Structure formats: C-alpha cells, structure tokens
Amino acid sequence: MEKIGVLLMNLGGPERITDVGPFLYNLFSDPEIIRLPVPAFQKPLAWLISTLRSTTSQQAYLSIGGGSPIRRITEQQARELQSKLRDKGLNVTTYIAMRYWHPFTESAIADMKADGIDQIVVLPLYPHFSISTSGSSFRELKKLRDSDSDFKKIPMRCVRSWFSQSGYLKSMVELISEQISLCESPADAHIFFTAHGVPKSYVEEAGDPYKEQIEDCSLLIINELEKYLGHSNSYTLSYQSRVGPVEWLKPYTEEVLTDLGKAKVNDLIVVPISFVGEHIETLQEIDIEYKEIAEKAGIVNFRRVKALNTHPTFIEGLSDLVVSSLNGPVVNIEKASELPEKVKLYPQEKWQWGWNNSSEVWNGRVAMIVFLILFIELISGSGPLHKLGIL
C-alpha cells in the first residue's frame, strides 16, 4: 500500500523561557514578517528587535506557564489526524514542520525520506492564506525541495487554504454555541471575531488574500451559527497582535473592545478566528490583556471561545481535507505559494529614495537609521542601549 505522508505546517513557539530570544530572532529574520528594501539589514534588525523584545516576551510566556503549548497541541492534532486517516484505510504518517522553532521543516523532510514516503500532502494549520503564514511556510518548503533532488522526486500535493471547509465551520459553530449557551439571553450575545493582523501593505500592495478570506470566513461562520441556533447574533471583526510603527489591518481589537463597552455590550463571545490551537495570542493576549481592556470598558461577561485544538469535528474536517486533496486535482508547491499575477510578491523591490506614504519605505528607512545607530554604539562602546543594560 502506498505510504502517504501528511505534513502539518505551523508557526512554532518557544517551549522554555531561554528559547524566547532565538525564537524571536528566527521570526523577525523572515522577510515575510518584516520586509526591508535592503536584504542585508534583515538579520541585524532581527537581532536588534529580538534583543529589545526578549524580556517583555519572556514575561508574557511566564504568565502562561513559561512556554508556548503550540508544539504539544500540534503533536496531539497530528496523532489524532493520523489515527482518523488510518481508520479510513489510508497508510498515513503525519509529520510536523514548524517555521520558527523546533521541529523545523528540515527535520520533517529528513524523517519523510527515511520512512520511504511515496506521496506527500502538505496541510498548513492556517485556515486562511497569508504571505506571512502559509505563504512563508510554502516558500521555505519549496526552497528546501528545490535543493534536494531526492526529496523533489516525491510527489507532493498542497492544500492552500481551507476556511470554507464544512468540518472547520461546523467545529467553530459548535465551540461558539457552547459559550453562547452560558449567556442569560443568548440572542443578545455579541460575537467578537479577533484575527491575527498583518500590515496593511501586504493586502494593498502585495495582493495578500488574507483580509478577504477572514471577512468571508466570519460571514460563513455567522450564517452557519444562525442555522444551528435558530437565531441571529450581531458580530464584529477585528485584528490583533500588531507590532511596529506601520499601519496594520483595522479595526484594532483593543479599540473595538472599548467601543463595544461604550455601546453597553454585556455578553461578549470572543472568537479567535485565525488560531487552530492555544498559544500566546489566545492565552496571554486575549485571556489577559484584552479581557482587562474589556472589563475596564464595562463589558460584564467576557467569554472566550476555546481554540479548535483536537475538537473531534475539527479533526474529522482535517481528515476530509487530506482525502479531498488525494482524490482531487494536484496543487503543487509552486501553485500553493503563488499570488495573483498582477502584483509583485515583494513590494519593497519598488523602493526608491524620496518621501511618500508607503509604510514599507518607512520600515526601510527606520531599519537603516537603527542599524547605523547600533553600529556606532557597538564601535564606541557607549550609548542608550548600554545605559539600558541591553549591550
């Protein structure tokens, strides 16, 4: 029987406090996370940002137990998906490829080759495609595949995005309805979708379909929820987790929470729409930071919907995605990672000197100024970073 490998791609996260700095360095070294007009500045800037943010990030991870649970949860998802697919008669082994922390993609590739896998299905654990999530993972996989003749011989099928898949929608509805049922007046509960944000330029300049897919997904869930409950609920979509001075997708989660408080919303059902497992953005950012903002704004009941994790309906939905990929037309790695032809993948390639409104140009200028300041301080041995104890 053909040996099938299912490669689950995810972000990764630091498992111990000492991992936080290196994890952040890997994250910000990715040009899809911070895109600069001068590639040579990428790693120095990544080092600087990871150094400056490390202490704050460590405190955030300490507040949720000292590390990210994303690897443990992804491994659980992989085991249950493997079991489900084997129950369906498929000779499947699941593998995990994390983008920014262990186990890295290289490790998964080595394991698949050692196991003699005959065909690979690549399934990103991101329902919605974005340059900075699935896109980055697909391009990393493509780079490694192109440099490995043996790996390149193994047939590969990719699932690009799956936010409209019935099992995913059903599992979201089931988890949301659990929280709505706790409300004194379920029909009056306000559904609050919060998705991980991306810089606005990714959508407007690079053609990232993420915003459109998030909006479509929110509406699909609301429609399915109404059928399931027999009544409609008002809803709002916002974006969280922005970093840096550039403009990200709006509205921002913290601002919307304040507005909902002013609107006298009592029962708020918070739905982390772009996260399929618990990690720092759900356990710390939503459960601690945003809950505090909501309570200060006057929201009485802040009910956060659990992440999908290993919810049975969700695992069933993932297995259906794999089966559909195997039985449907081949989507290769080139097709999975491409963007619309009318746009360029890296808008910063258009960068020119001169003042304009492009946030990515501002990113580049800021990076160059910061790098120059850092270089001078390293040479001189004195400056603000030394006074702060960072250098």
From Swiss-Prot:
It is found in: Cytoplasm. Catalyzes the ferrous insertion into protoporphyrin IX. PROSITE patterns: FERROCHELATASE (PS00534). Pfam families: Ferrochelatase. GO terms for cellular component: cytoplasm. Keywords: Cytoplasm, Heme biosynthesis, Iron, Lyase, Metal-binding, Porphyrin biosynthesis. GO terms for biological process: heme biosynthetic process. It comes from the Bacteria. CDD domains: Ferrochelatase_C, Ferrochelatase_N. Fe cation binds at residues 196, 281. Belongs to the ferrochelatase family. Pathway: Porphyrin-containing compound metabolism; protoheme biosynthesis; protoheme from protoporphyrin-IX: step 1/1. It catalyses: heme b + 2 H(+) = protoporphyrin IX + Fe(2+). It is an enzyme of class 4 (lyase). This is Ferrochelatase. It comes from Prochlorococcus marinus (strain MIT 9515). The gene is hemH. One of its GO terms (molecular function) is metal ion binding. InterPro entries: Ferrochelatase, Ferrochelatase_AS, Ferrochelatase_C, Ferrochelatase_N. HAMAP family: Ferrochelatase (MF_00323). Its EC number is 4.98.1.1. SUPFAM superfamilies: Chelatase (SSF53800), Chlorophyll a-b binding protein (SSF103511).
